[in-house]
Amino acid sequence: AFGGGVGLVACCDIAVASEQARFGLTESRLGLLPAVISPYVVAAIGPRQARRWFATAEQFDADTAARIGLVHQVVPADQLDAAVARQLELLGKAGPLAAASAKQLVRDVVATADRDALDEANAQLIARLRVSPEGQEGLGAFLDKRTPRWQT
């Protein structure tokens, strides 16, 4: 993935790459910058790494992508589909409302400087989830030692 492709990877909640994958933020070779994708890439790899890769336009391999936080997992090419299927299986076991709320929780934590307000919002969120039909099903399934019955 190069340029905008790296931006797409950075937007993914879960990113799996094959060992053969190559990456590069090569816009500076053209006298340009990865400005449009920069918020997503910086959020994924951090400002220090972004400064290096934006400025040098150096290509990097999948292991480097994992080390800097662009991808979560690197697998042999012949295991890529199975690794993605495993992630989908794990996501399918999560409650849909809880999974969506987890994404919002991360956004809120990053965006909120007021920790007291964040603690209050988080307490309200978990209270809403506990009494929701999904929360009740999840807790009931846990107590009954069974798989939750929800649609994902």
Model-derived features: where do they sit?
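Terminal low-complexity tails and localization/encapsulation signals of metabolic enzymes
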Residues: G140-T152
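Acidic, divalent-metal-coordinating active-site segment for phosphoryl/phosphodiester hydrolysis
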Residues: E58-T64
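C-terminal long alpha-helix characteristic of the crotonase
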Residues: V16-A21, V71-E120, A127, P133, ...
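Short helix- or helix-capping micro-motifs
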Residues: Q49-E58
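Glycine-rich phosphate-binding loop at the start of an alpha helix
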Residues: G3, A35, Q59, Q136
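Glycine-rich beta-to-alpha active-site loop
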Residues: A1-L30
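Hydrophobic, secondary-structure "cap" segments at the distal end of domains
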Residues: P39-R48
